[in-house]
């Protein structure tokens, strides 16, 4: 009976002392533990269920691992598609009228006078 009374407090206190028996869940890519309060040297990274904090050791750099790895490019030289995509589109539009065209228009326009040819530049 004395052995049972001695074993009962040990079984009750064991989950409080040893985290593996306490059922603390892993968080932050399995580098942290869900706790009510973080210990010294730990930082809160996110919140767990039941209003607990995800405590991660702050002396190490714990970053989330990417879910996918970047696809390596087989050819690093730019191709024709890259050149097409990087071209800035600028369009210059010129209206040029010659004296010959002006004379023909003036003769067809019943002798009206016209000014010298105008050159318009728009971009």
Curated annotation (Swiss-Prot):
Polar residues biased stretches: 109-123
Subcellular location: Secreted
Signal peptide: 1-19
Xref: Pfam families: Defensin_beta_2
GO molecular function: lipopolysaccharide binding; membrane destabilizing activity
Sequence segments annotated as region (Disordered): 100-123
Cystine bridges: 27-54, 34-48, 38-55
Propeptide: 65-123
Record carries keyword Transmembrane helix: no
Stored InterPro entries: Beta-defensin, Beta_defensin_dom
Keyword terms: Antibiotic, Antimicrobial, Cleavage on pair of basic residues, Defensin, Disulfide bond, Secreted, Signal
Protein name: Defensin beta 118
Chief localisation class: secreted
PANTHER family in the record: BETA-DEFENSIN 123-RELATED, DEFENSIN BETA 118
Function: Host defense peptide that exhibits antimicrobial activity against both Gram-negative bacteria, such as E.coli and S.typhimurium, and Gram-positive bacteria, such as S.aureus and B.subtilis. Inhibits cell adhesion of E.coli on intestinal epithelial enterocytes. Causes rapid permeabilization of both the outer and inner membrane of E.coli, leading to morphological alterations on the bacterial surface. Binds to bacterial lipopolysaccharides (LPS) with high affinity, and may thereby be involved in immunoregulation through LPS neutralization.
GO cellular component: extracellular region
Biological process, per Gene Ontology: antimicrobial humoral immune response mediated by antimicrobial peptide; cell-matrix adhesion; defense response to bacterium; defense response to Gram-negative bacterium; defense response to Gram-positive bacterium; innate immune response; killing of cells of another organism; negative regulation of cell adhesion
Coiled-coil annotated residue ranges, if any: none
Tissue specificity: High-level and epididymis-specific expression. Most abundant in the epithelium of the caput and is also present in the lumen and bound to sperm.
Similarity annotation: Belongs to the beta-defensin family.
Modifications made to the protein after synthesis: The three-dimensional structure formed by the three intramolecular disulfide bridges is indispensable for antimicrobial activity.
Hydrolase among keywords: no
């Amino acid at each position: 009976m004395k052995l049972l009374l001695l074993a009962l407090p040990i079984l009750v206190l064991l989950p409080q002392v040893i985290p593996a028996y306490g059922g603390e869940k892993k968080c932050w890519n399995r580098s942290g533990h869900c706790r009510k309060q973080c210990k010294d040297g730990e930082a809160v990274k996110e919140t767990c269920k039941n209003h607990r904090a995800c405590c991660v050791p702050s002396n190490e750099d714990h970053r989330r691992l990417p879910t996918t790895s970047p696809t390596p490019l087989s050819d690093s030289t730019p191709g024709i598609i890259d050149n097409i995509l990087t071209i800035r589109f600028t369009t210059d539009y010129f209206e040029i009228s010659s004296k010959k065209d002006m004379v023909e228009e003036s003769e067809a326009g019943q002798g009206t006078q016209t000014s010298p040819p105008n050159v318009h530049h728009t971009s």
